[in-house]
Amino acid sequence: ALSSAASDVYKRQVQDLRDAAAYLPHRVTVRAGDFPDLGACDVIINSVGKIELLYQSHDRLTEMDYTVPAVRSYAQKIKDSGFDGVLINITNPCDIVTRELALGLGLPRGRIFGTGTGLDTSRLLSALARQTGIDHKSITCYMLGEHGNQQFTPWSCVSFRGMPLDVWAEK
């Protein structure tokens, strides 16, 4: 179920997801809905945002004055729907909004995730694979910290085929 304030965008997103579902290996139902319908969902992707705010600044905190009040305005509606699944947050500032959702929904630990550094870890992994020619499945690396300008790579945790970066670099 999708729930959105922007009805034209909403309708296009519903259709895009319906079209994409044909390629999934399992049955997925995509339908338009509103907050009460979210109780029947297994997964919610939180993607509220106003991308125009980033046109003035590349700092993800710029979006906070919009996204945090938005989340606060509907978290109780999600909770009231009886939603008991997994929520994945992709909204910026990712860490802050994920925390707001956790507080507002009161779901058990491990049921609300923010994708912030997960996406950046994938980007780092892809870059290291391109640079080294090593298959990405043979590389271990992480981005940690707050998604955005405050994240970092703990280089001491990077390994190639199980070999620590410093050992690999000497070869």
Can you describe what each PLM-predicted range is?
Residues 52-53, 96:
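Short glycine-rich, flexible loops that bind phosphorylated cofactors or substrates
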Residues 115, 122-171:
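Substrate/ligand-engaging "lid" and interaction regions
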Residues 48-50:
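Conserved NAD(P)H cofactor-binding loop of Rossmann-fold oxidoreductase domains
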Residues 18-22, 99-110, 129-134:
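Short, surface-exposed basic-aromatic patches at helix termini and helix-loop junctions that form
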Residues 1-6:
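Single conserved hydrophobic/aromatic residue that forms the stacking wall/gate
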Residues 8-41:
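Conserved N-terminal Rossmann-fold NAD(P) cofactor-binding segment
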